[in-house]
Amino acid sequence: MSVSILIPQEWELSFSAGTFDANNLFMGGSEVMHIVPHKNKLFASIGYWQDENNIWYGGSDLSIGWSQVICLENEDDDWQVDLDLGYNHLRPGILKQVIFTRDYTGVQLNSPDTLLIAGAFSPNYISGIVSANIFIRDDQDGTWNQILVYEGDYSSEESYSMRDIEIFMDQVTGIENLIVSVGTQGIFSGKYNPEIDGKIEMVTLPEFGPLGTRPLGITTANDQLYFSSGSKIFKRNDGIDPNYEVVHNFNDLSSYVNPSVGGVRGLSTVPNPSGQNESLILMWCPDGQSKGIIFRLDPLEAQVFDRVYETKISLLVEDYLPGETVNYLLGAYNEFYAYIDPLTNAQYTMIGIESLIQENIYPSWNSYYSGGIIVLRNNDGQYSIQEVNGAIDFNDDPLVSVRCYVSSPFENETAIYFGGFDPNGHTSTNNAWIYKKNWNSLDLDAQNSNSAAHYNLKNNYPNPFNPSTNISYSLSKENFITITVYDLIGNKIKLLVNDYKSIGNHTVNWNGVNEKGVSVSAGLYLFSIEAVSY
């Protein structure tokens, strides 16, 4: 009889900016903005904001502009450039996979068509014209087709930032729409047309707009489309001539929203605690004093929502970094990402953040905490904090911000990829990064296993625990025993036992601190036991 187990491994750096691919194309950048699986490959969008390789910041190579899309074909390959947007298009605010199931008339396709779409805008300061475009990958030959979404006169007072797209089926007409946000210009829509290059036919006028603040998120909940703009959440009223209405407003919390911070960020959908329907979830970040408050909106009747406070992320960070003060916190760059922990099968949603700190106790980069912090939310609305590549040291390269995260699309790999960095207005050359956390699957022959037959790890008690817990185990044979505490994504937290143990029952106490003697945040932790017979 054989069994398969997952073993948490150490973190692995997947991409570091400032290298060349197999075709000698430069891959740099100050930030990884998205990581997206598409047709058994992995794609990432790279921005060159504040990067000195960018010709707009003093770079000498005209081929290096604002943005690239890079590709990883399998887990053992190296990343390579797949699309270079040049020096005219600013950084790609959109990289997303969408799946069309119907054409522009509403007729169901014989088979769904899965497309990878990037989005960016291009201001021409000489002509005074700005255009916003989407780029659709042709998976047959690896090229990208450019489609115009918006074109108009450029104004420094307006935003043309493209931050999200969403496939949505109109519940009245049955037509599938590609919904695209273009800054303060509004919400645009397109339909699937396989007869044209790029396969998407955009409508030149917005469905809704202009807007006061650039939208930062679009989501579908309970078959309704919602998007955020500043302090407001809008709902689409379906039909031949759709319109939008405000269904929730956070202006009671702040009368002013700094457009560069955004207001409502990461608008996403989570299960309603009642067990029926879906709720909206978001991070509230209105201005330079933002502390990253998480709210859940539970739907009531007639498009009324019950606003539920879940947590303030800055307080979690201050608990995680004892003695530190968080002056500003930003996060939820994209969506609240849902995933299932491969070790426990528990369901979580994940966001990344950055924190401006003031006490100079911990490693920092231009006063931002250097570590890449991940915030996990379980289905009970409980939150915990973890770090990419473990707790950062003063000698480590700064990560600063976790912007994106996705499960591996590769058949032979159980892993989660994380990407990020955020220049925050500071010079940031070749700081973009991608790490992955991998779990290896090991097949063991239970009949021939020496270690599995000779020890038994029991449930810890008390559980839940505060501040300490006891772990009991028994040995039927003398062994060298290692017992280690891990967090949910495989970071090693604390080595509890690393010694030769005799036959019989044993107990070890964990006082809830990590290897550095710092108390860990509330959450779920895993115990691993290994035995080597002599």
Predicted regions and their residues:
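Beta-strand-rich domains and repeat architectures in extracellular enzymes and scaffolds
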Residues: F20-G65
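Conserved blade-ending motifs and adjacent loop-strand segments that build the rim/top face
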Residues: T311-E335, Q382-F410
